Structures are given as C-alpha cells and as structure tokens.
Amino acid sequence: MRLRHKPYAMDRINEYSHIVIGNPEERAGNWKEVFGNEQPIHIEVGTGRGRFMYDMAKANPHINYIGIEKFTSVVVDALDKLIEEEVPNLKLINKDAEDLTVFFAKGEIDRVYLNFSDPWPKKRHTKRRLTYKTFLRNYEEVLVEGGEIHFKTDNQGLFEYSLMSMAEYGMLLTYLSLDLHNSDFEGNIMTEYEEKFSSKGHRIYRVEAKYRTEPMQ
C-alpha cells in the first residue's frame, strides 16, 4: 500500500484526542475507565482505515473496540469516519503494535483481530509477521486467560505459516475456513481489503485460535 502524506493528520489527531488516544502506555490497566464501563475489550492490530472496527462497534455496542494502526496518514482516515459519526465504544491508537504489552495490562483484552496483515513474504522478514511467535507471546500477555485471536487473509502462504506458528505455540485452532465466503460462517464483517480481494475472486482464509489454559500433555 502506497501511503500519501497528509500534512494535516497530526493536528487532526491531536484535536480529537478523546478518539485517538495519545500516550496509550499511560492507560494500561485502566482502559475500562477510558470507555466508562465494564464491557469486554477487543482490539484489531493493523486497523487500517477502520472500516472493520467501525462496523463491529456499531453491530456490537456491548463490546468495546480499539483499533491500532501505526501509520498516521492511514489512521486519520479512520478518525475522519468517527468525526462524522462518533461511535462511543470505539477508540484508536496511532502506535506500533510491537509495544502492545506497554499499552495494556496483563489480561486486559478479551480478543485480538488480525485482518489482511502484511504477509512479509521474504524469509528474512519472518519476524515482522504479526503471527510470528514474538507477537503471539505479546497477544497472550495482554489477553484474558484462554483469550482468542481471529485472523483473516487472502494470502495462502501467510495463512499456512500462521497455522503452523499458532500450532507450534500450542494454541487450539477452534475454527478454520479455507474459503470463508463460500462457507456456512455467519456474521462476517468485511474489511476494505477483503471486499477488494474477494471481488477479484481471491479466496479468503479465516482461523480462530485460542490460547490454552493448561499446558499440552
């Protein structure tokens, strides 16, 4: 994805600091206070322009959502949507997900979404994949016991790698689809990329993986 510089982006983000939360590390352990309720919290790592989080939050007002996106010129598009129609159970973070364990306390998050992440196909970039073991460890750190990852992609190579990585980490694969849009899965909410790729005939892969509460035998 080619990113277009938007000189107004930081000013816009700073103006709406109640939506794009600045200094999220200062909120660790207190995110329910940010939302003002005790509802569960789901996060999306690499939220892009925010369509998925926006639609999820609208459809599920009983759940709080946080979209994490490191690119300022992208997250400002998600912000613009929320300026037009603010959704109280959705916040944004404009930071790198490598710092996830700094933003949230242990067990503060109930679910992690990974949608159409950069596949980083070259072997030397394996550690950058959002399903690499280091990231899986970070997700486990902030998730409740037995927390889940829901992962979608159109990239077969990344999907196969992710299944292997999750299995090697000891996670339970509780749902698997090799062709989501031709499956019996109900309630799928599409991302911008998902709509684009599926319209071109790309197959969409999906997995739900759960962290074990007891060590493998």
Curated annotation (Swiss-Prot):
Pathway: tRNA modification; N(7)-methylguanine-tRNA biosynthesis
Enzyme class per UniProt: transferase
A GO term, aspect molecular function: tRNA (guanine(46)-N7)-methyltransferase activity
UniProt keyword Transmembrane, yes or no: no
Binding site for substrate: K122, D154, T191, E192, Y193, E194
Catalyzed reaction equations: guanosine(46) in tRNA + S-adenosyl-L-methionine = N(7)-methylguanosine(46) in tRNA + S-adenosyl-L-homocysteine
Enzyme Commission number(s): 2.1.1.33
Amino acids binding S-adenosyl-L-methionine: E44, E69, D96, D118
GO cellular component labels: tRNA methyltransferase complex
Catalytic residues (positions): D118
PROSITE patterns: SAM_MT_TRMB
Annotated coiled-coil segments of the chain: none
Keywords on record: Methyltransferase, S-adenosyl-L-methionine, Transferase, tRNA processing
Function of the molecule: Catalyzes the formation of N(7)-methylguanine at position 46 (m7G46) in tRNA.
Family membership: Belongs to the class I-like SAM-binding methyltransferase superfamily. TrmB family.
Annotated protein name in UniProt: tRNA (guanine-N(7)-)-methyltransferase
Organism of origin: Bacillus cereus (strain G9842)
